[in-house]
């Protein structure tokens, strides 16, 4: 899964639950067992790519 696809999936799940994107990211991090396998996969890719992007800044 590409980062663009991962973000789209996470955004659609957040919209479905009526949550803001970063609130949903925190929710997934705290409650991974309440998510689908695809959401966990998308979150993992988002987390890896976010860390990689911030490592370039620091």
Predicted regions and their residues:
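Acidic, low-complexity, intrinsically disordered interaction modules
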Residues: 5-58
């Amino acid at each position: 899964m590409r980062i663009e696809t991962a973000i789209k999936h996470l955004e659609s799940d957040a919209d479905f639950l009526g949550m803001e994107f970063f609130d949903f990211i925190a929710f997934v991090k705290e409650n991974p067992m309440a998510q689908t396998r695809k959401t966990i996969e998308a979150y993992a890719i988002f987390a890896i790519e976010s860390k990689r992007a911030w490592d370039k800044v620091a």
